[in-house]
Amino acid sequence: MKIIYLISTATAILLTGCNSETSEKTAQEIIQIATGSAPENISAEATVLAADGSVLREGSNDWTCMPGTPPNENVNPMCVDQAWQEWLQAYINQAPYDSEAKGFGVSYMLQGDQAVDNNDPFNTDRSVGTWVQEGPHLMLLMPASLMSDLPRDPYAGGPYVMWENNEFVHMMVPLEVTERPD
């Protein structure tokens, strides 16, 4: 619960001043958006956070679902296990994260995601980097050393490494064909 509170607090701070759809949606609609990102046997008992970090529903398993990550609330929902909760806390705060010292983690994003640079987690300049917008996918955390044989090209087909040479490195597992942007 401590990690959920920390994520909630960090998310609320980051969302100050962001354009949010949250005020236009009911709590039940936000819960449906968030829980639609994972299989029902996970999301039905998960804790659900609003985009502002407040707890909309307490859960009874170790999963947390949210309607999106800042500033894209209600657009790219995800359900994450406890390892991903810790990763998100570090990512949101741009704090150190050592994948070699952490355990395995799973994140579901069955509704897809916004376009991101596969090379740099904080790049917002679409003229630089390798941009990819995934449809439904899983994200897996593990020691970076275990990902050495995976491709780095998000368009190669199958799992690939995102954000190599960065402490937020993780494995992407697309569940549909990843199309190159036009």
Positions of PLM-derived features:
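Sec-dependent signal peptide recognition
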Residues: 2-9
